[in-house]
Every structure is written in structure tokens, then in C-alpha cells.
Amino acid sequence: MKITLFSSKPYWVKWFNELNKFSYEINYVTSACDIKSVNEAKGSEAVCCFVNDDLSKEVIETLHSNGTKVILMRCAGFNKVDLDTANKLGIPVLRVPAYSPNAVSEYALSLIMALNRKTHKAHDRVRDANFEINGMEGFNMVSKVYGIVGTGNIGEQLCRVLKLGFGAKVIAYDIIENKAVTDIGIEYVKTLDEIWKQCDVISLHTPLNSQTKYMVNSESIEKMRDGVMIINVSRGALVNASDAIVGLKSGKISSLGMDVYENETDYFYQDHNGSIIKDDNLSLLISYPNVMITSHQAWYTKEAISCICGTSLQNFVDFRSNQIKKSNLVNNPISSQPTQ
């Protein structure tokens, strides 16, 4: 059976080849999945796509016409997938729901600590033989109040490290409380406004939907403490970049760490060295000394990529044997039958 894997990189080839104990034929395509490249999957029973691949109505209809029966997302997010079209055409969309909450929560912590102690700037200085520490002042981690927005697996892990590891005060917000979080003495607040008003460091760990889009905007920033640090390792559009820039310029936001960006599709996972960044907000944010932007790599650990590749292959096995795990299925296809 054939799988076409879009947005292929050497690390995907390495791990899928190592874990493909089922001897599936895998067609590796370096291009992202979109209307221009979709015909590369012609004759493939499955396509395996990544977070920024474009699975629009037109793309999914073309996949269906070309014989694709199932979409395997090798990530947790699926906001670029037209689920309505997949449902109508009977195409299941399977994902990897929890490949490594530790990897992402640890990365969020690394952004907090780097922005606090300015280790990235210190490293650059020393490389230039500048051993001055002027402007490198930070704060003791225990001295600040941390607000965790979203306490699923990732948010819970960050709560644990901040509370139990550093002994810091942590408050949380989520529409559903996580008992594991309250069991370690962390209090939930009833509204986001309480997070905005009470916290020195705010870390976002929520999915992107109509309620969460631009949750960090001019109105919410105005309610925050002066000098707030904001961390986003979830979805780029949780933060309105234009409003964040205004907050950074005014000093309301002291530092911003983002592993995601709303318009990242045109840039992340690609080498644009020597090119002009045409996204004005992204170009401006990259230039700020108190902003750290990385290219959606919080998930990227050996353990996580092994889990992602293994689960993606197992999802195809489960589809072919009519034993799809409900926890991995993100849509409600009318009908779906594997090729016999």
C-alpha cells in the first residue's frame, strides 16, 4: 500500500524508514501539500501531511479524485484541514494527539528562561569578545506569578515544573479544570481577565478556534501588568502580532517568546537566508532584542519524532483494519473503506 508524505525533510525520511515495519511504499515529496503539488499523491491510498500543509476543499477533492482514502496528520493540529469536505467525501482525518507534552512544555520553559536571563544575547556578546554584563539583569524565577492558559497535557507539565521545580506561584485558566493541576496546589481563575491582571509571565497552551483567535490583543494587553512576558508555543493566531508590536514598543510587554506565528506557512521549515522577509510584522519582531521567535520546533525531540512517525504509521494500519482509535480521529466521515 502506498503513502505519499508531503513536506518531507531528511529527518522525516530517516524516522519513517526506520519505523516502517509494515513495508508500506512511501513516496516522499519535499513540497508542501497544496493545489500545485497535490497530484504527486495520485494513486496513494493515504497522504501524510504536516502542520502547515494546505488541505483546503479543492485539495481534498483532488485527493479524493486521485484515490486517496485517508489523511494522516503527523502532528496534533488540524486547523488547515477542511473537515467538512473530508466528512462529505468519507475521508477520515487521523492525527497524533499527544506525542510529547514534555518536549513542548520544556521548550516553553526554555523561552522563559532565555528571555529572562538573556542567554542568547550573552552568547552573542561573548562570541564578539564582549564580556560586559550591562543590560543582562534578570529575575529569580520564584519571584514571579505565572499564568498558564490551557491546562491539557502540555500546560499541566509546565505547571508542574514552575510550581514544584521553582516553587513559583502559578495560576491557571481553562474551560475544563484538570484535577492533576489542582492536586499540586494550583488555583484556577474564572476568567482570562484575572490571568491578564495578576501575572508577570503568561504562557499560552490552547487550541486555535473562534474563541481563542487573537486572545492576546490590544484590549487584553492593556489589562496586563506592566513589563509582562508572553510565551506562545501553541498556535500563531492566538496572538495579534500588530497589537503585540505596539505593546513591545510601549514597554507594556517586556519580552515575547514565540515558536509559532500566524503567517508562518510561507517561512517556517524553509531556508530564506539572503531573502527579504516580506511579512512586515515578522521582520520587525525578529529585529527586536527582547523577542525570540523560533520556527515551530518545540515538538522536535528524538522521543517526539519517533512517536509521531510510529503513531502515523499505526493510524494507517488501524484504518486498513477498520480499527481507528477515536482519540486520533478528528472528523466524522460519512463512510470510509480501505482498499482490499
From Swiss-Prot:
Pfam families from the UniProt entry: 2-Hacid_dh, 2-Hacid_dh_C
Disulfide bonds listed in the record: none
Gene3D superfamilies: NAD(P)-binding Rossmann-like Domain
Active-site residue list: R235, E264, H296 (proton donor)
Binding sites annotated in the UniProt record for NAD(+): N153, I154, D174, T206, P207, V233, S234, R235, D259
One CC-aspect GO term: phagocytic vesicle
CDD domains tied to this protein: LDH_like_2
Enzyme class: oxidoreductase
Keywords, ordered alphabetically: NAD, Oxidoreductase
GO molecular function: D-lactate dehydrogenase activity; NAD binding
InterPro entries reported for this sequence: D-isomer_2_OHA_DH_cat_dom, D-isomer_DH_CS, D-isomer_DH_NAD-bd, NAD(P)-bd_dom_sf
Enzyme Commission number(s): 1.1.1.28
Catalytic activity: (R)-lactate + NAD(+) = pyruvate + NADH + H(+)
Keyword check for NAD: yes
Recorded superkingdom: Eukaryota
Family according to the record: Belongs to the D-isomer specific 2-hydroxyacid dehydrogenase family.
Protein name according to UniProt: Putative D-lactate dehydrogenase
The gene coding this protein: ldhA
